[in-house]
Amino acid sequence: MDLTVSDRGMWNMTGDSEVTSLEHSRGGVINMNASPAYETLHSGSYTGNGRIFLMKTDLDSEKDGDKVTIDSAADDFSGLIMVKDSSLYTGKEVKGIRNLLLVTGASGKARFEGKDLDQGGLWDVTPVIKRGNEALDAEGNAVGDHTEWYLTKVEKKVNKDTIPLIKAPDNSYALYRLDIDSLRKRMGDFRFRNLKDTSGIWARDFHGSYDGQGINSKYNGFQLGYDNAANDKSVDGFFAERNISSPKYSYGSSENHGLSAGVYGTWFGDSGVYTNVVAKWGRDDMELKSWSNYPDRADYRTHNESLSVEFGKTFTKDNGLFLEPEAQMVFGYLGSKNYTTCRGKTVHMGGYDSAIGRLGILFGKRVTEGEHPYNYYLKFSVLHEFGGSRSFHLAALDGETMDYSEDYQDTWEEAGFGGSWHFGGNTSLYADVERSFGGNWNKKWQWNIGVNWQF
């Protein structure tokens, strides 16, 4: 039987096949992956260029896989081999020296090389193909001769449409840690209130931008809260927060809408000591899109919670200068989630226990004379994430799987400046600007502005 496969046409083999003459050219595909069983193809003569073989392999076994035998080939014969290796489905990484015979060309004129394969699963796979006299075993000996072609390695990388699925949880974590507040950032200088034992309401707006780990995003948020002053040394209250971010990934993007609520208590000592405790619960709604060869999308919701404990002491001089060392621990939990994309990819992200410590110092000055007292300061902090890794499992409809973990342990620094201004009655305005350095996610800038009304 004579057969022609050309002009991007495809021959779906469903069993062992033998042809007398095979013309294979101009992007034609011989698909040996149409059947789950390993198959053999025997061709008497072979002509053409630009042809593609799609073959099933089990490189780790060094024996199981589709086989092609060619008795004679034209002098200019060359072929491209794409593989679907069993390691794509088992999640097992093929290690060490491996050689799997795929093609035998008796004339020795045929030439083959690997071609990358992405069929919309999880992986982009490029096989390394070598002649038998160039493929070596563990002792350095050739495993075949120049008429044979061996698969020696399967190079896998995450395909373009899977990258956003991996990066989206990283963005959620980055937003969680960027949202960590200190007392002064959230409320300004609490001791700058006009009436120390009077309740009030406050509002704060913040905007920022960050990048890192393949993510670039702008974000903004708004907080509204109520203070209940039990006396001139203690204040408790509650607040609500709404935040939005628009991260960009390689070959994708998302829209994140967060909603959270919290309660807090703050206590002041006679010697400038303060303690601030904040408990917070939130959710994050994700609208995720990819836009490469196999565009995909997913919508899902995650939850998080945190408990922050902050201590500080203000040392004040007669000329208004002050120094304020601070220590803070934030314990948090980012919830687990299972979801399925529009193309049927399933994603499981495990929960994550976070523990972020911060050591900081402020240096500033208070000016208390006049109708509108104010203060200003410089600040610097070192932060460290003590939490470990977060686990993930992905699976595609074609059977490809992926298991990995993301280690969020990190150390970084933050620096900024800010101040408070009492501008009349029982109203105070406060603001600051900051950025971070040295971490996996860099806060390029963030500014905060807030106002406190007492009544």
Predicted segments with their positions:
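Internal active-site segments that recognize and position negatively charged phosphoryl groups
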Residues: 321-332
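Short secondary-structure subsegments characteristic of cysteine-rich extracellular domains
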Residues: 90-109, 217-233, 337, 346-354
